[in-house]
């Protein structure tokens, strides 16, 4: 995942690189070899984050200390002071008390709302799932909201049962209850959808698909669908067609007819799943 924060043009750029955990060190080593061979005007600055920093901070401050984190203050400072940041891979573990994902923190702290996920066939790379070798899909995944907003409850406060009548059937006989809020905002929908259309306009692409489940999840996905259709009208003058469809149908059609897709915009969770699927059509996540 790349986090680009490019400022005004200058002779040399300061770039923070973060290897993360485990395989991330191998990935970053290879990436730096390639980038340094290009003789780019870059001053490199190393920073750390991920599970390794969680363990290190626990040893330093003690388990349960609020200062324990996957993203240390010096890493945040490095990102703020440099022009761009590249990051490899990190480890996130479930069920660890006090643990906060480094990726989610970075996305929310710096408001990195666009997760741009391309999937394009490359010469010499086999793609057994797709009959048509000419796949060129760019997915705009909203990156800060939805179920990944990290608004969760466990154990569930009793007053939560009174918020919605749909909770009545969970009051008794269900055992423990956990809830994750699916948070959508008008601003969040508007800016990711407009970014997708602006990209299509700038690159000469003629379709933008919005993948949702507004037929079932009527409030959150209903909001995204409504805003998408409103914005789509603005781009008809540029010959760009906005197409909205159910996300589960998209999952099927990506396998059957991937060449029908050019630009896709989706909410955080659907975009996460569909972009991984699309990447496999072109050889795997390593090629996306």
Q: Where in the sequence are the language-model features?
A:
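Short coil/turn connectors at secondary-structure junctions
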Residues: 10-14, 40, 81-84, 111-112, ...
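A short beta-strand-loop structural module common to alpha/beta enzyme folds
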Residues: 41-53
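Generic N-terminal amphipathic, Lys/Arg-enriched alpha-helix
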Residues: 8-20, 47
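Glycine-rich phosphate-binding loop
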Residues: 74-94, 239-288
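Buried hydrophobic positions in well-ordered alpha/beta secondary-structure cores of metabolic enzymes
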Residues: 21-24, 83, 140, 196, ...
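N-terminal glycine-rich phosphate/adenylate-binding segment common to multiple enzyme folds
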Residues: 55-168, 179, 269-271
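Glycine-rich phosphate/diphosphate-binding loop of Rossmann-like nucleotide-binding domains
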Residues: 16-38, 161-246
